[in-house]
């Protein structure tokens, strides 16, 4: 799911991507008019919660109110990172940062395995999210693959060198407010016995 705006000349700007379990339109809880549209990229299951029911729940359950407030603040933090990327990062860094962000957010909901995750967005989607043309995105993806930072096969992205990608992107997951995820990685020792090692993510 993504939030987007269509400008007067018909061009689209993707404002954010949303993962499983996210509120895609939380601002509508208190704002009568939204300045964005919500669209889907893949088939999704949408759960609708009446505003009044959610407001009552927030009024009677302080922890729920705190969670909603935290979600809104995290949303704002992500928007600031995106603004910084589009305004000051190179094309190379923009895509690197976005792929790191996807990894951290999908890890938090158990959708990353061996640094590999589904990436159902098109190059046009990536362009509209990062302020580039689709041609520039295509060229930058080739550069990331040539540097052996990522592998992209169909709709599946694998991060080949997390440490280098994080350094290039200047990525720090703190703004996402997600738990650090330990990813099991099979290792074969010199005796041929498989053991599990855990790579701590930033």
Regions picked out by a protein language model, each given a short descriptive name:
Residues 105-202:
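Phosphate-/nucleic-acid-contacting segments
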Residues 42, 59-131:
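Polybasic "coupling" helices that flank or enter modular domains
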Residues 16-81:
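Cyclic-nucleotide recognition modules
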Residues 1-15, 26:
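N-terminal functional module of multi-domain proteins
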Residues 38, 95, 137:
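Short hydrophobic/aromatic patches on the structural cores and recognition surfaces of FHA
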């Amino acid at each position: 799911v993504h939030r987007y705006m269509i400008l007067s000349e018909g061009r689209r700007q993707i404002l954010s991507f949303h993962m499983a379990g996210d509120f895609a339109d939380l601002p509508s809880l208190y704002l009568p008019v939204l300045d964005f549209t919500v669209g889907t990229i893949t088939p999704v299951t949408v759960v609708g919660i009446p505003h009044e029911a959610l407001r009552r729940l927030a009024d009677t359950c302080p922890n729920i109110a705190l969670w909603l407030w935290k979600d809104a603040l995290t949303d704002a933090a992500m928007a600031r990172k995106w603004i910084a990327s589009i305004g000051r990062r190179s094309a190379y860094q923009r895509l690197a940062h976005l792929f790191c962000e996807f990894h951290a957010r999908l890890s938090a909901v158990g959708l990353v395995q061996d640094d590999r995750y589904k990436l159902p967005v098109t190059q046009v989607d990536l362009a509209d999210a990062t302020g580039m043309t689709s041609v520039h995105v295509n060229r930058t993806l080739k550069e990331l693959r040539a540097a052996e930072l990522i592998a992209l096969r169909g709709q599946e992205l694998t991060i080949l060198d997390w440490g280098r990608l994080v350094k290039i992107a200047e990525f720090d997951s703190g703004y996402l407010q997600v738990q650090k995820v330990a990813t099991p990685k099979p290792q074969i020792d010199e005796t041929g016995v498989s053991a599990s090692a855990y790579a701590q993510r930033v």
